[in-house]
């Protein structure tokens, strides 16, 4: 009995020494800890966002096989950008990448960009080929992207100057060849007749798929072409060497190539906004603005929704990843633990100038984060 009383006295003495318990103080301490945790999470997300933007810049250059961003000024872009129907349609119909994370659409598994449309502007020929004593338009160089993909369509676009009276125009496309013994320097590719009415000039397209395929098989035969568009009075209406006020009216080739996409599996994950207090691995919104980079060489989109992953991957949340959990249980010290990373990504379409001042319309894989998860 005396022993029990002694224990009670000791307990009471300890309570007196410890003093009264302030519940409000404990609540404030807990609140401060929570605030500190949220602040750390915000800082972590901001660092993750900055790293994601820098990674995107590196990935775009790498996937487009560019060592550095093309150095093309806005003035040069205004001169080179064709004022032509196919390009205007691409730009006008271009929609900022929508958040299509809910669908199960096809996506490309390849690392590098899959090209869909290439717009090639004329350049100076490697050969000094002259017809009638003066250089003739036009010579086109082709990138390896055309050579290693299936060409499904090739159109030559030419601009015809406006006429003052109704007239019939005879359009002729000639392929330049090495001079033959009889003096022949060209052979016909296409010819057509069309009626023009007074008003503005028009763009006319001509199918050149066959000659392009021949050029790709025998590059040495590509010496260029000559374009003629004569009206009834013998005036050449084709813009081959643009004069004053004719910027963007150069002839150009529109080449469409195709590649086969591959199907990938679907996954699910958490979606959060910037004000979310979610600590688990989650997908957060991120808009990449190319104009903010000074990347004027990207024609469209000027910005797109890239998104990024951030959050904790606690082992208590890993019933979905039993293999990772087992590894941690087997070797808790040697395992670095799972990371919050993209588990599904989708491509973006991009219209841009490459280093050779060619306009490319292509698909760049794995540029939009659709799902995040722990792995």
Swiss-Prot record:
Superkingdom to which the source organism belongs: Eukaryota
GO cellular component, as recorded: extracellular space
Listed name of the protein: Growth/differentiation factor 8
Disulfide bonds: 272-282, 281-340, 309-372, 313-374
Prosequence residues removed at maturation: 24-266
Disorder named in the UniProt entry: Muscle hypertrophy: A condition characterized by increased muscle bulk and strength. Affected individuals are exceptionally strong.
Chief location bin: secreted
GO biological process annotation, one example: skeletal muscle satellite cell differentiation
InterPro entries named in the record: Cystine-knot_cytokine, TGF-b_C, TGF-b_propeptide, TGF-beta-rel, TGFb_CS
The keyword Disulfide bond is assigned to this record: yes
């Amino acid at each position: 009995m005396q022993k029990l009383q002694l224990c009670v006295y000791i307990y009471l003495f300890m309570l007196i020494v410890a003093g009264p318990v302030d519940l409000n103080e404990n609540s404030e301490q807990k609140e401060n800890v929570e605030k500190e945790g949220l602040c750390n999470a915000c800082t972590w997300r901001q660092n993750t966002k900055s790293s994601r933007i820098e990674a995107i810049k590196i990935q775009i250059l790498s996937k487009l096989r560019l060592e550095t961003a093309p150095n093309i000024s806005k003035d040069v872009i205004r001169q080179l950008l064709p004022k032509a129907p196919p390009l205007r349609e691409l730009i006008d119909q271009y929609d900022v990448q929508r958040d299509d994370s809910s669908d199960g659409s096809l996506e490309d598994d390849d690392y590098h960009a899959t090209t869909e449309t290439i717009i090639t502007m004329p350049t100076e020929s490697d050969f000094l080929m002259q017809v009638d004593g003066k250089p003739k338009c036009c010579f086109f160089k082709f990138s390896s992207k055309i050579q290693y993909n299936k060409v499904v369509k090739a159109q030559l676009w030419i601009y015809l100057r406006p006429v003052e009276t109704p007239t019939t125009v005879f359009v002729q496309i000639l392929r330049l060849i090495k001079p033959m013994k009889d003096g022949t320097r060209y052979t016909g590719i296409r010819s057509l007749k069309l009626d023009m009415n007074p008003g503005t000039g028009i763009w006319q397209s001509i199918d050149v798929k066959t000659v392009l395929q021949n050029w790709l098989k025998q590059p040495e035969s590509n010496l260029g072409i000559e374009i003629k568009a004569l009206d009834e009075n013998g005036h050449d209406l084709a813009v081959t060497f643009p004069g004053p006020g004719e910027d963007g009216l150069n002839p150009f080739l529109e080449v469409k190539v195709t590649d086969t996409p591959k199907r990938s599996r679907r996954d699910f994950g958490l979606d959060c906004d910037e004000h979310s207090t979610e600590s688990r691995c989650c997908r957060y919104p991120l808009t990449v603005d190319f104009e903010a980079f000074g990347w004027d060489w990207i024609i469209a989109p000027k910005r797109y929704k890239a998104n990024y992953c951030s959050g904790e991957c606690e082992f208590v949340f890993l019933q979905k990843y039993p293999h990772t959990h087992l590894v941690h249980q087997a070797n808790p010290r040697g395992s670095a633990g799972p990371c919050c990373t993209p588990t599904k990504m989708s491509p973006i379409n991009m219209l841009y100038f490459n280093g050779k001042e060619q306009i490319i319309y292509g698909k760049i894989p794995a540029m939009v984060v659709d799902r995040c998860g722990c792995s």
